[in-house]
């Protein structure tokens, strides 16, 4: 078996935008990983519908098509 071919497996602190944090292990080189959604705030797991738009895509869409009427 070859030695030293696997990446390092590090402890990582996961931080969600909702404030939830937890620790896991990963091969990334960072100590912290920031997420937009996690299982505590994702609509599938919470059962609540909400628009999750962190990049302003909904507002951009509405402004682009505001002149069109049904």
From Swiss-Prot:
- Metal-binding keyword on record: yes
Q: Pfam families, per this entry?
A: Ribosomal_L31
Give the residues the record marks as binding Zn(2+).
16, 18, 38, 41
Q: Which InterPro entries match?
A: Ribosomal_bL28/bL31-like_sf (IPR034704), Ribosomal_bL31 (IPR002150), Ribosomal_bL31_A (IPR027491), Ribosomal_bL31_sf (IPR042105)
The cofactor(s) it depends on are: Zn(2+)
Q: What SUPFAM superfamilies does the record tag this protein with?
A: L28p-like
Report the cofactor remark: Binds 1 zinc ion per subunit.
- Which cellular component appears as one GO term in the record? ribosome
Alphabetic keyword roster? Metal-binding, Ribonucleoprotein, Ribosomal protein, RNA-binding, rRNA-binding, Zinc
Gene Ontology biological process terms, A to Z: translation
GO molecular function annotation: metal ion binding; rRNA binding; structural constituent of ribosome
Cross-referenced Gene3D superfamilies, in alphabetical order? Answer: Ribosomal protein L31 (4.10.830.30)
Function as written in the Swiss-Prot or TrEMBL entry: Binds the 23S rRNA.
**Stated family:** Belongs to the bacterial ribosomal protein bL31 family. Type A subfamily.
PANTHER family hit by this protein:
50S RIBOSOMAL PROTEIN L31, CHLOROPLASTIC, LARGE RIBOSOMAL SUBUNIT PROTEIN BL31A
* UniProt cross-references to NCBIfam families, sorted A to Z: L31, PRK00019.1, PRK00528.1
The protein's assembly and partners: Part of the 50S ribosomal subunit.
Q: What is this protein called?
A: Large ribosomal subunit protein bL31
């Amino acid at each position: 078996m070859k030695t030293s071919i696997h990446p390092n497996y590090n402890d990582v602190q996961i931080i969600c935008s909702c404030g939830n944090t937890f620790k896991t292990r990963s091969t990334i080189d960072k100590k912290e990983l920031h997420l937009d959604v996690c299982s505590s705030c994702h609509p599938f797991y919470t059962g609540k519908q909400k628009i999750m738009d962190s990049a302003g895509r909904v507002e951009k869409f509405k402004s682009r098509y505001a002149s069109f009427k049904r």
